Amino acid sequence: MANNNIMGIDFGTHFACVGIFKNERIEICPNQQGNRTTPSVVSFVGDDKLVGDEAKAQMDRNPLNTIYDVKRLLGRKTTDELFDHEVKKLSFKVTTYEDNNEKIEFQVNYKSNVVTLTPIEIATSILEQIKHTAETFIGGESIKKAVISVPTDFTEKQRNDLKEAATAAGITVVRMIHEHSAVALAYGYDQVKECSETTNESKESNVMVFDLGGSGVSASMIRVRSKLFEMIGNVSDHTVSGEHFDHVLVQHFTQEFNRKYRCDLTDNARSKAKLKSACEKAKRNLSNMTQAALEIDSLYDGRDFFTNITRARFEDMASGLIKGSINAVSQLLEKCNMTKEQVDKVLLVGGASRIPSVQNQLLNFFDNRQDILERSMNQEEVVAHGTTIQATILAADKSNQSLTCNSSNISMGAPFSAKFTPVTIGIQDSNGNLIPIIPSSSLIPCKRTFTLNTSSENQDNLNMAVYQGSAPLAKDNQLVSRFIFKSSPNPIDVTFEIDNNNTLLIKSEQANYSIKF
């Protein structure tokens, strides 16, 4: 297949990852240091701007001029509910625009000057580095297009800011897909292939994506049947994340150090950054070992800090976070009106999903069904793998070719559809709000059924206005069409379905409509 140079990018909170179709298979591109993920970090040192691994190395020694976690602040305003909470955890200076105190800027020392930079500019630097990584991997050939994954709860503003950053980095975003859709695609592609080769029957399964990553915990339910992927619900909670597990360790060791040396290291940005980095490493080690050591030279005022912690102690301190992460699972089941027995597989995503107690609690929740947790996927790479599959399919579409997949590679063959809805499709409620029916980045084909009720007695007709967009108020979105139903003493069930031809089918007992997008 001709290389149409569409890469798949996972722009993560802590790390970014990029994949490309090469040698008849999906490949995750290693960076200059040989690592398959690149830290989402930018550091300014004298006259140099460092990105990725080199920048992350500066977090301990140059914390005031090293920007990280930019994904959390992309598309945000200072008036957002979580802004103050997020900023308190950062070591660098966050300011606001002179002419707009709701807009966020970062202040650093660069080339002997005080420089202000926006979240978009920092994201641009990271995406430029990712683009360079992919281009180097394929021998220096230019790559100008990408599929980029976004969280399920990313707002339209956040999407637009990420797209603007990509454009500034020389990347055309041909599609944005939900991170969980990418995970399902990475997992389900082989399942679909296996099913289609072994039987003509339509095998249906309910797959839950459990994502405990740097920015929060989220869970999605995706129904898989033959070549149909249908996202039927998702929940997210930003009060529980891998970062919060790190913070548990940071608090614990800060108190231990302060007790031991009778001082307060929290007034020193460099000391806090060094401790945070060591705690991140300890958390990762505790997923594989029952005890982890911290060895930090000259942590504060020339004092070394050598200590350790057991996995049992860590999991006890983090028990509230672990319980909170499992709550997302029960909330998702309630939202989808499903029982835990109806879930066939749980896909684990995000570094913190490796914590043994998290996995044990998930197993307990699902009555110790040993085969329910899918542990074979690489949690750090699976989203990029899924976005790259989507990118490869789009490249094949442009070449009038199709794709199939086996356990090791992707090649031309029988067709497989993996398109996604570009925008949310919803209806207006009686208060003028948009009620999403089919979320953006839902895998196509997909369908949803909902109920219309009369809002008052003696109502002759039911009016339904259909919009596309993600703005909370319906009027701020694009009107698709208006429909009128005759009032009925019983609720009216309406089904929205988007087929492989991007046609919206609206079905009810009274009438059927079709709208081509």
From Swiss-Prot:
Pfam families: HSP70 (PF00012). It comes from the Eukaryota. The keyword Chaperone applies. GO terms for molecular function: ATP binding; ATP hydrolysis activity; ATP-dependent protein folding chaperone; heat shock protein binding; protein folding chaperone. GO terms for biological process: chaperone cofactor-dependent protein refolding; protein refolding. It comes from Dictyostelium discoideum. This is Heat shock 70-related protein 5. Disulfide bonds: none annotated. Keywords: ATP-binding, Chaperone, Nucleotide-binding. May function in protein folding and assembly, and disassembly of protein complexes. GO terms for cellular component: cytoplasm; phagocytic vesicle. Belongs to the heat shock protein 70 family.
